[in-house]
C-alpha cells in the first residue's frame, strides 16, 4: 500500500491541512465510515510503534516532510479503568498543557491534546524532541473526554531553539564589524594627518617669509611688496556641517582683506622713508632699490616721484647759499 500511496501522489504534492479540515473533514468521515476523495492519512497502531518509525510508515509522496499525519484508535490502559494506554516498547507519550478547542465558524467541533514522547519508563523517562497533536471530535469544551475511539494525529519534531540560518557564522559577523571600525579609524587618521600636514606647510612658509623679511623701517616696502605678490595656499578643512561656510566664502573674505591691505597706506612708513633719504643723500642706490621694490596703489604718488621732488628741494636749498 505504501508503494501505491507514493506512486499515486503527483510530483510537488504537499499535504498541509488546517486543524478545522483535519477534524471537520478527515476525522468526521473516518468515524462515520465515509471515504475521502483521496486517502492520504493512513491507520497505524501508535502504541505499538516508536515515533522514529512513523516517518517511514506515514511518508506521503516523494517530497521531504517535517510532519506526519495518521489515524489511531485509542485503547484503555486497564479494562475497567478510564485512562488511555499511551505506552510503547521503548517509552511513553505524556500529555502536557491544557486541551485546546478546534473551531469552525465560531463553533466547537473538536479538541486538541498535546503529548510529548519520553524514553524509558515513568517517572524516570528522558524527554525527547518528539511532539504529537491528538485531535478528537467533541461538540463542547465541557463535554467528558472519551478514552476510546478514533483520533487523527499530527507528529513532528520540536525545532532546535535559536537555530541559525544555513551558513551563518557569528565570528565572521563580529570580524566584519571590527574590520569596519578599523577602516573608519584609519580613514579618520589619514584625513587628520593630511590637514595637519597642510597647516604645518603653511606655517613653515609663513616662518620662511618672516625670516627673510625681518622688521626693518628701511625694508618695510619690500616686505609689503613680497606679501602682496605671493599667494598663500588654501588650507583644506573637513566639511563638518553646511553652517561652517564654503570655499567660495573663504576666497571672497581673503580677497576683501587683500584689497583693504593695498588701499590702506601707513603714513608712518612714508615718513620713515623720507627721513632715510635726508639722512643718506649721497647713497641713492639704497633708496632707489627700496623705492622701486615698493609698488603702491595708483591713487597715491609713487615713491620715485617723491624722491625727485625731495632732490629738487635740496638742490634749491643749497643754491641759496653762496660758496665761501
Curated annotation (Swiss-Prot):
<dbReference type="GO" id="GO:0003700">
    <property type="term" value="F:DNA-binding transcription factor activity"/>
</dbReference>
<comment type="similarity">
    <text>Belongs to the plant vascular related NAC-domain protein family.</text>
</comment>
<dbReference type="GO" id="GO:0009733">
    <property type="term" value="P:response to auxin"/>
</dbReference>
<keyword id="KW-0010">Activator</keyword>
<dbReference type="GO" id="GO:0000976">
    <property type="term" value="F:transcription cis-regulatory region binding"/>
</dbReference>
<dbReference type="GO" id="GO:0071365">
    <property type="term" value="P:cellular response to auxin stimulus"/>
</dbReference>
<keyword id="KW-0539">Nucleus</keyword>
<dbReference type="GO" id="GO:0009620">
    <property type="term" value="P:response to fungus"/>
</dbReference>
<dbReference type="GO" id="GO:0009737">
    <property type="term" value="P:response to abscisic acid"/>
</dbReference>
<dbReference type="GO" id="GO:0009735">
    <property type="term" value="P:response to cytokinin"/>
</dbReference>
<dbReference type="GO" id="GO:0010628">
    <property type="term" value="P:positive regulation of gene expression"/>
</dbReference>
<keyword id="KW-0238">DNA-binding</keyword>
<feature type="region of interest" description="Disordered">
    <location>
        <begin position="232"/>
        <end position="259"/>
    </location>
</feature>
<dbReference type="InterPro" id="IPR003441">
    <property type="entry name" value="NAC-dom"/>
</dbReference>
<feature type="DNA-binding region">
    <location>
        <begin position="109"/>
        <end position="164"/>
    </location>
</feature>
<dbReference type="GO" id="GO:0071555">
    <property type="term" value="P:cell wall organization"/>
</dbReference>
<feature type="domain" description="NAC">
    <location>
        <begin position="9"/>
        <end position="158"/>
    </location>
</feature>
<dbReference type="GO" id="GO:0045491">
    <property type="term" value="P:xylan metabolic process"/>
</dbReference>
<dbReference type="GO" id="GO:0090059">
    <property type="term" value="P:protoxylem development"/>
</dbReference>
<comment type="function">
    <text>Transcription activator that binds to the secondary wall NAC binding element (SNBE), 5'-(T/A)NN(C/T)(T/C/G)TNNNNNNNA(A/C)GN(A/C/T)(A/T)-3', in the promoter of target genes (e.g. genes involved in secondary wall biosynthesis, cell wall modification such as xylan accumulation, and programmed cell death). Involved in xylem formation in roots and shoots, especially regulating protoxylem vessel differentiation by promoting immature xylem vessel-specific genes expression.</text>
</comment>
<dbReference type="GO" id="GO:0009741">
    <property type="term" value="P:response to brassinosteroid"/>
</dbReference>
<dbReference type="GO" id="GO:0043565">
    <property type="term" value="F:sequence-specific DNA binding"/>
</dbReference>
<dbReference type="GO" id="GO:0046982">
    <property type="term" value="F:protein heterodimerization activity"/>
</dbReference>
<keyword id="KW-0804">Transcription</keyword>
<dbReference type="Pfam" id="PF02365">
    <property type="entry name" value="NAM"/>
</dbReference>
<comment type="function">
    <text>Required for the soilborne fungal pathogen Verticillium longisporum-induced transdifferentiation of chloroplast-containing bundle sheath cells to functional xylem elements leading to stunted growth, vein clearing, and leaf chloroses, as well as xylem hyperplasia within the vasculature of leaves, hypocotyls, and roots due to reinitiation of cambial activity and transdifferentiation of xylem parenchyma cells. This developmental reprogramming also mediates an increased drought stress tolerance.</text>
</comment>
<dbReference type="GO" id="GO:0006355">
    <property type="term" value="P:regulation of DNA-templated transcription"/>
</dbReference>
<keyword id="KW-0961">Cell wall biogenesis/degradation</keyword>
<keyword id="KW-0805">Transcription regulation</keyword>
<keyword id="KW-0611">Plant defense</keyword>
<feature type="compositionally biased region" description="Low complexity">
    <location>
        <begin position="232"/>
        <end position="244"/>
    </location>
</feature>
<dbReference type="GO" id="GO:0050832">
    <property type="term" value="P:defense response to fungus"/>
</dbReference>
<dbReference type="GO" id="GO:0005634">
    <property type="term" value="C:nucleus"/>
</dbReference>
<dbReference type="GO" id="GO:0048759">
    <property type="term" value="P:xylem vessel member cell differentiation"/>
</dbReference>
<comment type="subunit">
    <text>Forms homodimer and heterodimers with other VND proteins (e.g. NAC037/VND1, NAC076/VND2 and NAC105/VND3) via their N-termini. Interacts with NAC083/VNI2.</text>
</comment>
<dbReference type="GO" id="GO:0042802">
    <property type="term" value="F:identical protein binding"/>
</dbReference>
<dbReference type="GO" id="GO:0010089">
    <property type="term" value="P:xylem development"/>
</dbReference>
<dbReference type="InterPro" id="IPR036093">
    <property type="entry name" value="NAC_dom_sf"/>
</dbReference>
<dbReference type="GO" id="GO:0045893">
    <property type="term" value="P:positive regulation of DNA-templated transcription"/>
</dbReference>
<keyword id="KW-0217">Developmental protein</keyword>
<protein>
    <recommendedName>
        <fullName>NAC domain-containing protein 30</fullName>
    </recommendedName>
</protein>
<dbReference type="GO" id="GO:0042803">
    <property type="term" value="F:protein homodimerization activity"/>
</dbReference>
Amino acid at each position: 500500500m505504501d508503494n501505491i500511496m507514493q506512486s499515486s501522489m503527483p510530483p510537488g504534492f504537499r499535504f498541509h491541512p488546517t486543524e478545522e479540515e483535519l477534524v471537520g473533514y478527515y476525522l468526521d468521515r473516518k468515524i462515520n465510515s465515509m471515504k475521502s476523495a483521496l486517502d492520504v492519512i493512513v491507520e497505524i497502531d501508535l502504541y505499538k510503534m516508536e515515533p522514529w518509525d512513523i516517518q517511514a510508515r506515514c511518508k506521503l509522496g516523494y517530497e521531504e516532510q517535517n510532519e506526519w499525519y495518521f489515524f489511531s484508535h485509542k485503547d484503555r490502559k486497564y479494562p475497567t479503568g478510564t485512562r488511555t494506554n499511551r505506552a510503547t516498547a521503548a517509552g511513553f507519550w505524556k500529555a502536557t498543557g491544557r486541551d485546546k478547542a478546534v473551531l469552525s465558524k465560531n463553533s466547537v467541533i473538536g479538541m486538541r491534546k498535546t503529548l510529548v514522547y519520553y524514553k524509558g519508563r515513568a517517572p524516570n523517562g528522558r524527554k525527547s524532541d518528539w511532539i504529537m497533536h491528538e485531535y478528537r471530535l467533541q461538540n463542547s469544551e465541557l463535554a467528558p473526554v472519551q478514552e476510546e475511539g478514533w483520533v487523527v494525529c499530527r507528529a513532528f519534531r520540536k525545532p532546535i531553539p535559536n537555530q541559525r540560518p544555513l551558513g551563518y557564522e557569528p565570528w565572521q559577523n563580529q570580524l566584519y564589524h571590527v574590520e569596519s571600525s578599523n577602516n573608519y579609524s584609519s580613514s579618520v587618521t589619514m584625513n587628520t594627518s593630511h590637514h595637519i600636514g597642510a597647516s604645518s606647510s603653511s606655517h613653515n612658509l609663513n616662518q620662511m617669509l618672516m625670516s627673510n623679511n625681518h622688521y626693518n623701517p628701511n625694508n618695510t616696502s619690500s616686505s609689503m611688496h613680497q606679501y602682496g605678490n605671493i599667494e598663500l595656499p588654501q588650507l583644506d578643512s573637513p566639511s563638518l556641517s553646511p553652517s561652517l561656510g564654503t570655499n567660495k566664502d573663504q576666497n571672497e573674505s581673503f580677497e576683501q582683506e587683500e584689497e583693504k591691505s593695498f588701499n590702506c597706506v601707513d603714513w608712518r612708513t612714508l615718513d620713515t622713508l623720507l627721513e632715510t633719504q635726508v639722512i643718506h643723500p649721497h647713497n641713492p642706490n639704497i633708496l632707489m632699490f627700496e623705492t622701486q621694490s615698493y609698488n603702491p596703489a595708483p591713487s597715491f604718488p609713487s615713491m620715485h616721484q617723491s624722491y625727485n621732488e625731495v632732490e629738487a628741494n635740496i638742490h634749491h636749498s643749497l643754491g641759496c647759499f653762496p660758496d665761501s
